[in-house]
Structure formats: C-alpha cells, structure tokens
Amino acid sequence: MVRLTLDLIARNSNLKPRKEETISQCLKKITHINFSDKNIDAIEDLSLCKNLSVLYLYDNCISQITNLNYATNLTHLYLQNNCIPCIENLRSLKKLEKLYLGGNYIAVIEGLEGLGELRELHVENQRLPLGEKLLFDPRTLHSLAKSLSILNISNNNIDDIRDLEILENLNQLIAVDNQLLHVKDLEFLLNKLMKLWKIDLNGNPVCLKPKYRDRLILVSKSLEFLDGKEIKNIERQFLMNWKASKDAKKISKKRSSKNEDASNSLISNFETMHHIVPVYYPQVGKPKLVFFSEIQRYPVNGNASPESSREDYTKIIEEMGNLSLKQSESLLTKNDVHEPHLFHNPKEKENLFAENE
C-alpha cells in the first residue's frame, strides 16, 4: 500500500523548482493533485499545499479521511470507490463546493456541518450490509439547506426521501435504483422543492404506478426532466387542461349531490308530518269503521325554496286537520261509497248492485 506524502507529491508533480527554490515553495504553487488508482490507503500531512483546490483520490484503498484540515482552499474532493465507512474531518474545508463519496461504506450522511459552499454531494452506490439503507443526519441536511443544488443518492436502498424537503435550493436529484414506492411522498417533496428542474427515479418501484409521470409533472411547475426524459410544454399543458376538466366535473357532481340531498330532506320532512289521514268507508247495515290511508305524495319542485315548500306542507296539513270526523261522515252516504268486499251476506251485494242499476 502507498501513503500520500509531500515527497510523493513533489516527485510526481509537473512543477519544476526554479534555482534556489525550495520544495516547500514549489508545493505552495500546486492547485491540482491527481493520485487516483494508485493503491493509496492513507493521506499524510498536506499542510504545505496551501493553494490546493482540486484533489483526485478516487479508486484507492483509503479507509479514513484525515490530514485535510489545512487544505482550506480545497473546492473539489474526489474520494469515490475507496473503503471509507464515515464522513469526518471535513468541517475546516469552508470553500468545498463538490464532494464525491460514492462507492464507499458510508451508512449515514453526516459530518458536513459548516460546509456552507457545498453545491454538489455524490454518495451513490454505498456498499451497505444487506437490509440496511442510507440515512440522513438532520443536522447535516439543515447545514446544506441553502447551498446544495445537486444530490446523487442512487442505489442505496432508500425508501423515503421526504426529509430532503429542507434542501430549498436543490435543482437536481438523482435517486436511481432505490426502493421508493409511494407517489404521494414524491408529490409532497416536489411541492417543497420549488427550484428542482431535474429528477431521475429510474429503477424504483414507484415508476410502475399508474399515472406516475403525469402526477409528478402536474405537481411541479419547475420540473424540466423526469427520469432522463424532457418534459415538453405541450405535454404539461395537456395534463393541466385534463386536470382542470376533471376538477370541474367533480365540483359539478358535488353541487348536484347537495341539491339532491336537500330535496330528499324536504320530502322526508313532509312524510314524517301527519302522514296518515282518517278516511270513512260507511258500511251498509254494519257499524261504521274508520280506516287510515297514506296521504298521496307529490313531487317537490327542486327550484322551490325550503320556506315556500314548508308553507305548502303546513297548508295541506291544516286543511286535513280541519276536516272533522263528523264532516267526513256526512260527506259519504250509502250510495256514495260502496265496498262490496266488506259485506258478509251475498244477498246484500246483489241488492246493492240492483239499486245502482
């Protein structure tokens, strides 16, 4: 294995010291260091590289992030495909803009507090134990809320990304090959991320849900690319018109339902008030009996106001109430109402029909 030292950097540097120029002075001029795929397993003191801005250390065997405290001018750090289990010792890198940590053993996104200039964070393809997923420390998310614009969290067994709502300036999110399942969770997130114009969710179960693409396009006006496919204006406008038409139909249906319920309520109220009326059927030669018959129901005008309908009902009921039993009896004579089926004697039926003839 190889350790990254100042001597190694000096020997592999393209910078040639001038006469009477020391190695220290030469190292101060270095801005880019590329030791990718060199079997490096540790980082030694780089404090002399004061102007270092870009450091390439990907595809090595580094197991711990160390000795970068004095590289305060570092803006780009490439540490993907190493053996790093946790994010640490980076808080002094106040100018860091891009951090690449994909392909390591990181289980929690943490330790990035104080990196107020960090714009890109790449933590895809972490080699996690079976069944585990990548987690986010709320403190780190809060510290990156205003700066982070690009986030790559692909292939990390993630099933919920609603915590990312705090990243108010995020404009690109790559979350391919995770376990995202619910469209509603994505709608919630897109409602919060007002500057997001690109999101890639290919390889998630949610992509197979009905109307998945349509729903995300409708909920986000800023989105321009979804799963690698451009969202054209004509597509968005068509979906917006379709949704407006659907919403209008729902409103119309609700209004019709309310009107119908109001009409049914009026009819129900009428039925419960004096719904039976005494009717006399005098029998020939028998004691007079009183039968009760249901009042006839009349359709209610849907346009009539509830007040006028109640007045009509009250009037009908009052007229019925004024009809006394004696008046009802006097209005019906033997010859007016006949109920042959009530006679027990057949001769009485024959006499009755003979009188009518």
Swiss-Prot record:
GO terms for cellular component: centrosome; cytoplasm; manchette; microtubule cytoskeleton; microtubule organizing center. PROSITE patterns: LRR (PS51450). Pfam families: LRR_4, LRR_9. LRR repeats lie at residues 29-50, 51-72, 73-94, 95-116, 117-138, 147-168, 169-190. It is found in: Cytoplasm, Cytoskeleton; Cytoplasm, Cytoskeleton, Microtubule organizing center, Centrosome. Residues 204-242 form the LRRCT domain. Keywords: Cytoplasm, Cytoskeleton, Leucine-rich repeat, Repeat. SMART domains: LRR_SD22 (SM00365). Phosphorylated; in the testis. It comes from the Eukaryota. CDD domains: PPP1R42. One of its GO terms (molecular function) is actin binding. Interacts with PPP1CC isoform gamma-2; the interaction is direct. Interacts with actin, dynein, KIF5B, KIFC1 and tubulin. Associates with microtubules. Regulates phosphatase activity of protein phosphatase 1 (PP1) complexes in the testis. This is Protein phosphatase 1 regulatory subunit 42. It comes from Macaca fascicularis.
